[in-house]
Each structure stands twice: as C-alpha cells, then as structure tokens.
Amino acid sequence: MAALVVSETAEPGSRVGPGRGRISRGRLANQIPPEILNNPQLQAAVQALPSNYNFEIPKTIWRIQQAQAKKVALQMPEGLLLFACTIVDILERFTKAEVMVMGDVTYGACCVDDFTARALGVDFLVHYGHSCLVPMDTSVQDFRVLYVFVDIRIDTAHLLDSVRLTFAPGSSLALVSTIQFVSTLQAAAQELKAEYHVSVPQCKPLSPGEILGCTSPRLPKEVEAVVYLGDGRFHLESVMIANPNVPAYRYDPYSKVLSREHYDHQRMQATRQEAIAAARSAKTWGLILGTLGRQGSPKILEHLESRLKGLGLPFVRLLLSEIFPSKLSLLPMVDVWVQVACPRLSIDWGSAFPKPLLTPYEAAVALKDISWQQPYPMDFYAGNSLGPWTVNHGRDPGPRGLGQPASGKVQQGFRGQSPAPACEGCSCADLKAALPAS
C-alpha cells in the first residue's frame, strides 16, 4: 500500500474522515485510469519484478502523471536496491519524467530525504519500504512524496502451522511486524483468534502491529509470548527491550523458521547506566543532530540546548549523517556526547565509542530530569511518550478534518516537524483504520 503526501478532496458522500473507516482497495484502484491499469505493455513490464512484492507501479505512474512531475527520485532501503533499475526503466517508459535513484543508505522511515531530493531539483519523491513516520510541511505545492510500503506476500499457511505447533491452544499471544508484513500479520491474527487469545498491539502513530527499532508498545501482563514476523533481529529487539519479561519468538518468512529469541537485558542496562554515570561528571557536552534524511529532531536538540544552558554546562553542536567513533575522537575536548539520531546506535554500539554516547532519554536521566526507567523505554516516536526528549511528545494527537493539512500527504520541507502525527488523513491512516488494534 502506498501513501501520497498530498491533500485530496473526498468524493461527495464518501465515508472518509475521523473514525469513518477506510477507502477500499477497489476505490483506490478505480482512481487509477483503466488505460494505466489495463495497459498490456505495462503489465508485461511489471512481470520483471517479483510477483509477491507490491511496488504499486500503476499507482506510482498515475501519481507522477497527476503531479506533472518532471524529475522523480526513488529512495529505498538497501534490500530493495536490486529492483531500482527495473523500476526506473518502467517509470521512465510510461511517464514523461526523468527518474533517478538516491543511493545514500536508508535505515528506516526516519531517513526520508526530501531535503536532498529538492536540492537536486526533484519534484516527486517515491520512498519505498517504510510507513509515513515523519510529518512535513504541506505549504509548498511543487514537491510531492509518495510512500510505497512494498507489501510482501508470504506463505501464511506455514506461519499458522508453525504457531500451532509451538504454542498450546488458549495461549495469549501478541503479534508484531514491520510495515511490509502488517497485512499478513492481520490475516494471521484473524485465523488464530479461534484457538488463541491474540492481540495486535499498537503504539500510535504506528499502524496496529507495526514496530520500529526505536518504538514498540508495552504489552499487557497477560501476554504469554510475542511473535515477530520478519527477518533479522533489529525490530524484534525493540519490542524485547520494551517487554523484558515476555518470551519472544521470531518467524522468518524467508527461511520459514520460528525460533525462540533471547536478549541480554542485564548487560545492556548495566552498560547504559555506566555511560550515564560517567556523563554526570562531564564538563563539556557534545550534541549531535543526525542529518541522514529526517533522522534528527531539531525540537529535541533545542530542548537539550535549553537544559544545558540552564545548568550552565558548555556544549558544542555537531551535524553528522552517520556517527562513527573515529569521527568523534577528533574532538577530544568533549566529555560526553548526546546523539539525536537513532537511539539504537547508543544502545547497540555505545560501548564502541571512547566517550559516553547517550540517547536523549539517557541524557535526561544524567541531568536528573527523570529517574532511570524499568523497563527501558522504547518510545522515541510514540505519541504517548515520557518527555520532551522524544520526537512526538506534547503534540496534538487529535485527527485532522477533511481539507486540513496533511490530508493525503505532501510532506514537504520545513526543518521542524508538524504538530500532529504523520499519518492522519492519508492512505496510511486508511490502513490504520482498517487494522484495529486488539
């Protein structure tokens, strides 16, 4: 499913609006002209892409044509880059646009790089593989962003059989995943509800069941196990950190293996508390604003600056797209670093740095704004978060009405982030309305 960041007016009598359900796939498809949907040459060209990956080529072509875009940029995680040249060929063949691939690393939805795209003269950015996490200004009308989630179809029957062989009937299970597999996750949850107490938790503004490496929900005490659908451990570790007492399992849809997973919570927490303790004696602080796409939050940076100024602590600012120990070692006068980029960089790799490398939350603990939390909070993008050291803290979570900014989705360029969740009113919000948390 894709989400276009551009305001769209609802059809007369439509049920679009807060709490009114979603636009059906059929209606969305009907908005694409039949000469695109039924074009035999386009259908043949799309066969060059894997059939179980939904790159939404017809919709992308239609949106490019609607926007009358002349220069289009494609941004995608490295796992999808092998399909980039094929997509470029298709889009250039069936539109009048010049299409380029942005090759800088894309770790997640926080890395959507509209700044670089617009600096290159791009008027339409297609971001693949992530949901609409970062809100952008809607006032500039010469730039559009289309999010293509790249829904991946897998062998759902094997997933269901694996769960049934592993867990006794009546068990209380929580199911989570990344955006690519959320549709499959919901289908699996519906199938399993006859035999298990199944929940699909939600950490707003994410979709039900969706987790990020830095943002995961706290699970109710009655949950006996959490099952993550996806490859790798990065996202899974997020929900494990947030729920240290819940046994975690991972179903890899590629290897078709359901495995029990473990995490050394004691070691992680001891390492992070040691870094915080060292920071409390620091004389000079360094504040890093991540510049990889929209990874850095100016709002959090401003909060940290305000706190350090109030305490009379000197600090330096550093802008970095990627943070390496060798780079920070060039500034030996800094005693402690706080990176406003990716919390997992500190959690996973902080011990590799010569000086303490704190997350904004850990900086708040070091400055005694908050006590150490148990469990460790994974709420960096959560709407309901602990404090101003998180991205969406204090923002109005209420839904926007029709015709108000960010209905549809143009996320555009101002350096701050808009005062409401990213997904209100766009087709990503339609997805969330269709996938109720349970």
Curated annotation (Swiss-Prot):
Gene3D superfamilies: Diphthamide synthesis DPH1/DPH2 domain 1, Diphthamide synthesis DPH1/DPH2 domain 2, Diphthamide synthesis DPH1/DPH2 domain 3
GO CC field: 2-(3-amino-3-carboxypropyl)histidine synthase complex; cell junction; cytoplasm; nucleoplasm
One MF term in the entry's GO annotations: metal ion binding
InterPro entries: DPH1/DPH2, DPH1/DPH2_1, DPH1/DPH2_2, DPH1/DPH2_3
Keywords: Cytoplasm, Iron, Iron-sulfur, Metal-binding, Nucleus, Phosphoprotein, S-adenosyl-L-methionine, Transferase
Record's keyword annotation contains RNA-binding: no
PTM sites of type Phosphoserine: 418
Region (Disordered): 1-24, 392-414
Coiled coil: none
Pathway field: Protein modification; peptidyl-diphthamide biosynthesis
Superkingdom field: Eukaryota
Annotated GO biological process: fibroblast proliferation; protein histidyl modification to diphthamide
Entry EC no(s): 2.5.1.108
Pfam families for the chain: Diphthamide_syn
Major localization class: nucleus
Cofactor(s) the protein requires to work: [4Fe-4S] cluster
Swiss-Prot/TrEMBL catalytic activity: L-histidyl-[translation elongation factor 2] + S-adenosyl-L-methionine = 2-[(3S)-amino-3-carboxypropyl]-L-histidyl-[translation elongation factor 2] + S-methyl-5'-thioadenosine + H(+)
Protein's UniProt keywords contain Iron: yes
Free-text remark on how the cofactor is bound: Binds 1 [4Fe-4S] cluster per subunit. The cluster is coordinated with 3 cysteines and an exchangeable S-adenosyl-L-methionine.
Compartment(s) of residence: Nucleus; Cytoplasm
Binding site for [4Fe-4S] cluster: 110, 214, 342
SUBUNIT field: Component of the 2-(3-amino-3-carboxypropyl)histidine synthase complex composed of DPH1, DPH2, DPH3 and a NADH-dependent reductase. Interacts with DPH2. Interacts with RBM8A.
Function: Catalyzes the first step of diphthamide biosynthesis, a post-translational modification of histidine which occurs in elongation factor 2. DPH1 and DPH2 transfer a 3-amino-3-carboxypropyl (ACP) group from S-adenosyl-L-methionine (SAM) to a histidine residue, the reaction is assisted by a reduction system comprising DPH3 and a NADH-dependent reductase.
Protein name: 2-(3-amino-3-carboxypropyl)histidine synthase subunit 1
Lineage: Eukaryota, Metazoa, Chordata, Craniata, Vertebrata
Gene: DPH1
